[in-house]
Amino acid sequence: MQIEVFEEASPLGAEDVTAGLRAHLIAKTAVLPLIPLTVLLRDEDDRVLGGIRGQVALCWLQVDHFWVDDALRGQGHGSRLLDRAENAARMHGAIGAHLTTSTFQAEGFYRKQGYAEIGRLRDRPPGHDRIWMSKRWG
């Protein structure tokens, strides 16, 4: 047996780790769909000025990436994007949403949207915290 360390995103064998984990999850939870979800904000020239990327997995919306162009922040676009993503996830049977943010990012925004802190990692990066948040629909 040998252990290898790679400093690249998708070395040969990386997909085997994902497939193995998926097989384990299915064995423990039954077959649950993994539904990719992308919501985009475009201008009249079709340029993307914001959006959300994530997935509906294990009955929850997982928000992986959320961005709104600096010039458009504070105008309600982020709230509209998040609302659309949450509604799309509900259509696929999601019971809530979860995400991570940082103290230098959008913690206050998410709290206004009804998200609550469920965990915190201090000093990631030093001087800032990484925050896990969730919102259960009901």
Spans of model-derived segments:
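Acidic/histidine-enriched, beta-strand-rich ligand/metal-binding domains
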Residues: 72-73, 96, 109
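Conserved acetyl-CoA pyrophosphate-binding loop and the N-cap/start of the following alpha-helix
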Residues: 72, 76-84
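Conserved catalytic-core motifs of GNAT/GCN5-like acyltransferases
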Residues: 98-100, 116-132
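Conserved active-site tyrosine of GNAT-family acetyltransferases
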Residues: 17, 110, 115
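Acetyl-CoA-dependent GNAT
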Residues: 3-64, 69, 104, 119, ...
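Conserved GNAT acetyl-CoA-binding A-motif
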Residues: 89-102
